[in-house]
A protein has these predicted regions:
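Membrane-proximal, proline-rich intrinsically disordered regions
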Residues: 20-67, 94-96, 234
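Elongated scaffold/linker segments in the mid-to-C-terminal portions of large proteins
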Residues: 45, 49, 53-56, 81-102, ...
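Conserved, well-structured interaction surfaces
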Residues: 38-56, 77-149, 163-175, 179-197, ...
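TPR/Sel1-like alpha-solenoid repeat signature
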Residues: 135, 206-209
Length: 427
């Protein structure tokens, strides 16, 4: 979609291309104080908002998707083995060298940017509503790191030169996130419009609290390996329900508005109009490249001839993300609209996202996917073979359907926005 957050750039560029003959410059321009205009603040804030775009596109997505019950990270007789980073996620054989878990620095950088703008805008003396968005993003980034890595440093200030900030227990980080969110929610915007899309709002912060609270016993457990889900007591459950109710009663969201069906919510033209999205990353092939989900989820040789998307793919596909049989079962239910996001059984051709009855042909034959994945060997490579049989192992996701111009002309990037918090999660 075409994002609105960066419209301030156009204003700046217009100024750069205009001649100037008026030398009566305001005296403030002689100083290096931080600009206080709305445009200047928006420019600085946008850098924070987009800090998670890179990890969400690739490494964070790999770590979350492949280590869950959703996908398996396959290899093809050595192709896409990549030091077992993908299969390690699926088998929970994590290594410090795995690229798929290497997003810590990018997310921590977002925290540093947030801390810098908080200082630039006045720190503790700043108006609460001015720095609330930066504090919200700082809390969100802490959540991502805490959820992924456990014990992490609490980065609530700009570090001094050579300052060592020690890791804190996961429980303390969770409590810090909670404290921050409770403090800033009253100062965040409560609108849900094109202007607030992709930015922290009251609803984004409340949705983050819900996610924090629903897993509170895990995050605050003395030791996760000793946590017993059958006997825990969630002291935050009432608060979790209360914030769900707040989002529901706010009346800003619903499951269907802005979409023409479940699958269309995730198409390349999705945007702020999709009222199921509480908080989303607004990828755009013109201004925010990097959303490349189709590259890893598309059948490996779909680039041969015309793809099952209905157009020729000019860039190669990895094809290594295969849905687990258990996940596939959830999306192959009779009469369920969500079935449309899964490529299953005999592959059909699609026409502008609509499944046709025409078989897709590869090397002269229709192709049929196997729900139950067969490996060539029972080892950590998860090798299915570099051949048609291997490519057909596992159903594939077409949830974030690509379009030709994006994929072929922008380095496999896509316009599809990625929801981080959805109204469906709250319900």
């Amino acid at each position: 979609m075409k994002i609105n957050i960066k419209t301030f750039l156009a204003v700046g560029l217009i100024g750069l291309t205009s001649a100037c003959s008026d030398l009566d410059v305001d005296v403030n321009s002689y100083y290096t104080s931080y600009p206080s205009s709305d445009i200047a603040i928006a420019a600085k804030m946008a850098d924070i908002y987009y800090s998670f775009a890179g990890p969400l596109n690739r490494r964070y997505d790999e770590a979350q998707s492949l280590s869950s019950d959703e996908y398996v990270g396959l290899s093809f007789s050595g192709n896409y083995i990549d030091n077992n980073t993908y299969s390690n996620m699926s088998l929970h054989l994590f290594s410090q060298d795995d690229a798929s878990t290497g997003y810590y620095a990018d997310v921590a950088s977002g925290i540093s940017k947030a801390n810098q703008i908080i200082v630039d805008l006045g720190g503790d003396a700043a108006k609460p509503n001015v720095i609330a968005p930066a504090r919200a993003m700082r809390a969100f980034f802490h959540f991502i790191l805490m959820d992924s890595y456990g014990d992490i440093p609490i980065l609530d200030h700009l570090a001094e030169a050579n300052e060592v900030i020690e890791r804190q227990p996961r429980a303390d980080v969770a409590k810090f996130i909670e404290k921050e969110l409770l403090a800033i929610i009253p100062y965040l915007p409560s609108d849900n419009t094109q202007v607030t899309y992709g930015k922290p709002t009251k609803w984004m912060a409340e949705a983050l609290l819900v996610k924090l609270y629903i897993n509170w016993p895990v995050y605050t457990a003395t030791s996760v390996d000793k946590y017993d889900a059958t006997s825990y007591n969630n002291e935050k459950l009432s608060s979790c329900v209360a914030y769900c109710d707040s989002i529901i009663l706010g009346g800003k969201f619903n499951l269907s508005e802005g979409a023409t069906g479940y699958h269309s919510k995730f198409f390349a033209d999705n945007s702020y109009k999709v009222k199921d999205f509480i908080y989303a990353m607004p990828y755009d092939t013109k201004t925010l490249l990097g959303m490349t989900y189709a590259r890893f989820r598309t059948w490996k040789k779909a680039t041969t001839g015309v793809s099952y998307y209905g157009w020729s793919m000019g860039n190669s596909c990895a094809g290594l993300f295969a849905l687990t049989p258990q996940m596939s079962d959830l999306f192959t239910l009779n009469g369920d609209a969500r079935n449309n996001v899964i490529l299953s059984d005999t592959i059909k051709v699609y026409d502008n996202g609509v499944k046709t009855k025409t078989n897709w042909i590869y090397n002269g034959s229709p192709q049929a996917l196997n729900k139950n994945i067969t490996l060539l060997a029972q080892d950590r490579d998860l090798n299915v073979g570099e051949n048609t049989n291997g490519y057909n192992q596992g159903y594939k996701s077409i949830k974030f359907l690509p379009v030709a111009d994006d994929y072929n002309n922008h380095g496999r990037s896509q316009n599809n926005d990625v929801p981080i918090f959805r109204y469906a999660d709250i319900l």
